[in-house]
Amino acid sequence: MPQNLLTLFLTAKEVEGCSPKTIAYYESTLQHMTKALAKPYTRISSDDLREYLNRYENERHAGKVTIDNIRRIMSSFFAWLEDEDYIVKSPVRRIHRVKTAVMAKEVLSDENLETLRDRCGTLRDLAIVDILASTGMRVGELVGLNIADVNLQERECLVTGKGNKQRPV
């Protein structure tokens, strides 16, 4: 069995097109799991992983979304180990998705939006508020806009979002 299966997995994710931030998150999550369980991947059971998730949640007061993210990363890793024939069956198969509440995002009222617009000190700030309010794009997406991404005639922007995916707004 290869010395560092985690490195091979991360390389596979890189080839699949995962972003450097995603790969770093996978790496830190799986390194923590590996250190905590202190046993070869071939010997890790579903019970080991459940205990790990439970301990992680309790010790770190982690939320359900965080725990499900960890479970999802473990699932991806162990599915890869199974696909590559390093293990017979993924121990994550029997660990179900963690139910999480979907929280509705708070929307600015028309009155609050007007107050925000009135307090803009420059045309630049006003343009930022207006484009965010009218398109629903993320702040990070707005920051990443270039002049070439804006088509004033069509009143459209080409936005690069999460995962380097582009979409018109």
Name each model-derived stretch:
Residues 87, 102, 110-139, 163-166:
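Basic, Lys/Arg- and aromatic-enriched nucleic-acid-binding interface segment
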Residues 96-98, 109-110, 159-160:
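Acidic/polar active-site rim loop that often engages polyanionic ligands
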Residues 135, 144-169:
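Conserved tyrosine-mediated DNA breakage-rejoining catalytic core shared by Y-recombinases
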Residues 3, 7-104:
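N-terminal core-binding DNA-recognition domain of tyrosine recombinases/integrases
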Residues 4-5, 48, 108-111, 123-124:
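Alpha-helix N-cap/N′ positions at the starts of helices
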Residues 43, 107, 168:
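Short aromatic/basic micro-patch
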Residues 74, 128, 142:
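Short, basic/aromatic-rich helical patch in the C-terminal catalytic core of site-specific tyrosine
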